[in-house]
Curated annotation (Swiss-Prot):
GO terms for biological process: chrysobactin catabolic process; iron ion transport. The gene is fes. SUPFAM superfamilies: alpha/beta-Hydrolases, E set domains. The lineage of its organism: Bacteria, Pseudomonadati, Pseudomonadota, Gammaproteobacteria, Enterobacterales. It comes from Dickeya dadantii (strain 3937). This is Iron(III) enterobactin esterase. Its EC number is 3.1.1.108. One of its GO terms (molecular function) is iron ion binding. It holds the Pfam family Esterase. Belongs to the Fes family. PANTHER family: ENTEROCHELIN ESTERASE-RELATED, IRON(III) ENTEROBACTIN ESTERASE. It is found in: Cytoplasm.
Length: 435
């Protein structure tokens, strides 16, 4: 994480007569961006800088450098946030105040005059459609921040970690480019051909650590498995935490979502999917890597629709799935008004799973749940609070965490490790880091 510079550091940097010169840029590169300055009241000031490869405004065709920051900038705006050019230089810059524990992913989007916003319609619906079409047309221009010292991830994404952001020590090797690929001897990629679901998908089966009793190893189910096996591979972080003694030897089952249509059908409260997992997939996986059938040694994890699905599985089959890791769960489902009409949230009909928990009374099968959502995903944070209150009232054990960030894989990856650790060992790594 970056060390905070004293207040006024960036103003001095930008007012320097050497601003834009090679030595000036070398200093910025050594510091890494975004630059962070200390402020009062639990906030810092972060500054993004970009070097125009074509020089100053006399030679460069660049007219905007949009900052697309998860949960911070408004990508629905007809006038999105742009960095500003320091006149007469190749320096583009923009600063803003943010929570000192914020974390988020971001891209920079340099564009030329032909890509500037069009003249938008006065009709609201048409204007929204025009804005979306225009904004999506800029996606090919998005770049990772070349001055960010961490390795870019997610293709065009960079990571920003403020000084007090929760530790993600398990991911340091990934961030600095030294992470090893998964141990081929521990990884099995198989096809699950489901008769009950009438479809086929990839499954990644991974084992960590050494156990004297393989059949007693915990089972950890990871929904949206393609994300955590390929796009943001979890393996190196799991190996690091297991080697450090923070996680026990375990069996990890990554379930591919197949595609968007299938995901939207199977993850929101679909009994058929979970029956097929229990009847078909778990026996197939256990033949390859034995694991416990104890619900207290079985964790189901997911984000967004996956967070909804993980809790649904636990609530409906607590005798098999006793531990749940839900991140940014879509507990609004199926009431889209929480997204489209959030200002009316207090009058809206709750999501079906919230209602089910509220009306179910005291549970006979208390679950152990790690639940988190981001302060900068307002609708998701609201429905997660609804669900948290319902779960506690029903007698479930819930460890709730609200982080400074958005609907962001960069935040979820840390919560995954922390959640698995708490659910499998009882340790809260963030509490330990504060002691």
């Amino acid at each position: 994480m970056p060390a905070a510079q004293p207040s006024g550091f960036v103003a001095t940097l930008l007012s320097s007569p050497q601003a834009g010169e090679e030595a000036w840029w070398q200093q910025v590169a050594r510091l890494g961006t975004p630059l962070v300055e200390a402020q009062d009241s639990g906030r810092v000031r972060m500054t993004f800088l970009w070097r125009d490869p074509d020089g100053d405004e006399r030679y460069s065709a660049i007219r905007r450098v949009y900052a697309d920051i998860n949960g911070v900038t408004d990508h629905h705006s007809t006038d999105p946030q742009s960095l500003e050019r320091l006149p007469g230089t190749d320096v583009w810059h923009w600063s803003m105040a943010i929570e000192h524990d914020w974390r988020g992913s971001y891209s920079l989007i340099p564009i030329v005059a032909a890509q500037l916003p069009p003249v938008f319609s006065d009709d609201g619906q048409l204007r929204d459609e025009q804005q979306r079409e225009w904004w999506c047309s800029l996606f090919p221009c998005a770049i990772a921040d070349p001055l960010n010292r961490d390795q870019s991830w997610g293709e065009q994404l960079s990571a920003a970690h403020m000084p007090a952001a929760p530790s993600q020590q398990a991911w340091r090797a990934v961030d600095n480019g030294t992470a090893l690929p998964p141990d081929a001897a521990r990884l099995t990629v198989l096809d699950w051909k489901s008769e009950q679901l009438d479809n086929q998908r990839r499954i990644w089966l991974y084992t960590t650590g050494i156990s004297d009793e393989p059949a007693q190893r915990p089972l950890c189910i990871v929904l949206d498995g393609q994300k955590w096996a390929e796009e943001t591979p979890l393996f190196a972080a799991l190996e690091a935490e297991t080697a450090a003694g923070h996680l026990p030897p375990a069996v990890w089952l990554f379930i591919d979502a197949i595609d968007g249509e299938t995901r939207c059908r199977e993850l929101p409260c679909d009994a058929a999917f979970w029956l097929a997992v229990q009847d078909e997939l778990l026996p197939q996986a256990a033949r390859l890597a034995p694991f416990s059938d104890d619900p207290d040694r079985t964790v189901v994890s997911g984000q967004s629709y996956g967070g909804l699905a993980a809790l649904y599985a636990g609530l409906h089959w607590p005798q098999r799935f006793g531990r749940v890791l839900t991140q940014s769960g879509s507990f609004w489902w199926p009431n889209l008004q929480f997204i489209t009409d959030f200002d009316q949230r207090d009058t809206l009909e709750p999501g079906v799973l919230v209602t089910e928990v509220r009306q179910g009374g005291q549970t006979a099968w208390p679950l152990v749940i790690f639940q988190e959502a981001g302060r900068r995903e307002a609708d998701i944070a609201f429905v997660n609070q609804q669900m948290h209150e319902a779960l506690v009232a029903a007698g479930h054990q819930v460890h709730q965490r609200v982080y400074a960030g958005g609907h962001d894989t960069l935040c979820w990856r840390g919560g995954l490790i922390d959640g698995f650790r708490w659910l499998l060992t009882g340790d809260d790594p963030q509490a330990a880091s504060r002691d």
